[in-house]
UniProtKB/Swiss-Prot annotation:
Subcellular localization, as worded in the UniProt entry: Secreted
Pfam family, one: Defensin_2
Top-level taxon of the source organism: Eukaryota
Protein name (record): Defensin-B
Principal place of residence: secreted
PROSITE patterns attached to this UniProt entry: INVERT_DEFENSINS
A cellular component annotation (GO) from this entry: extracellular region
Keyword tags: Antibiotic, Antimicrobial, Defensin, Disulfide bond, Secreted
Function according to Swiss-Prot or TrEMBL: Has antibacterial activity against M.luteus and E.coli.
Upper classification of the organism: Eukaryota, Metazoa, Spiralia, Lophotrochozoa, Mollusca
Cystine pairings recorded for this chain: 4-25, 10-33, 14-35
Record-stated family: Belongs to the invertebrate defensin family. Type 2 subfamily.
Amino acid sequence: GFGCPNDYPCHRHCKSIPGRYGGYCGGXHRLRCTC
């Protein structure tokens, strides 16, 4: 979700959440956006 497996859209999504500074793609196929 949120653009994964591309880290950039996920990172931008996480930065939009108050208190979060970014995120990355994780999970078996890097399909989960982790903030």
